[in-house]
Curated annotation (Swiss-Prot):
InterPro entries: Ribosomal_bS20, Ribosomal_bS20_sf
Entry keywords, A to Z: Ribonucleoprotein, Ribosomal protein, RNA-binding, rRNA-binding
Entries under SUPFAM superfamilies matching the protein: Ribosomal protein S20
Coiled-coil intervals, chain numbering: none
Function of the protein: Binds directly to 16S ribosomal RNA.
Family: Belongs to the bacterial ribosomal protein bS20 family.
Database matches in Pfam families: Ribosomal_S20p
One GO term describing the cellular component: small ribosomal subunit
GO molecular function terms listed in the Swiss-Prot or TrEMBL record: small ribosomal subunit rRNA binding; structural constituent of ribosome
A biological process from GO: translation
Highest taxon of source: Bacteria
Gene that specifies this protein: rpsT
Protein name (record): Small ribosomal subunit protein bS20
PANTHER family the record matches: 30S RIBOSOMAL PROTEIN S20, SMALL RIBOSOMAL SUBUNIT PROTEIN BS20C
Amino acid sequence: MANHKSAEKRIRQTLKRTERNRYYRTRIKNITKAVKEAVASNDATKAEEALKVANKDLHKFVSKGILPKNTAARKVSRLHASVKKLSAQIA
């Protein structure tokens, strides 16, 4: 256990940040999973709706400083490519 006041504060801060980061990591994982599942089930409309939500949320995380800009762009690009490929198969 911590012996100094500053160390106790650091422990509290670390716990708070860990909890917040866990929330965002889970949210990002669930967002991308929703798009991938919609693509896997060959449901183009559901995939496009999920992609819209993913695009909005990932860019929101960039503006909050949670994700680097290029990381979000890469994730959105890959999701968009999979949805586009699905749309091409159906059409």
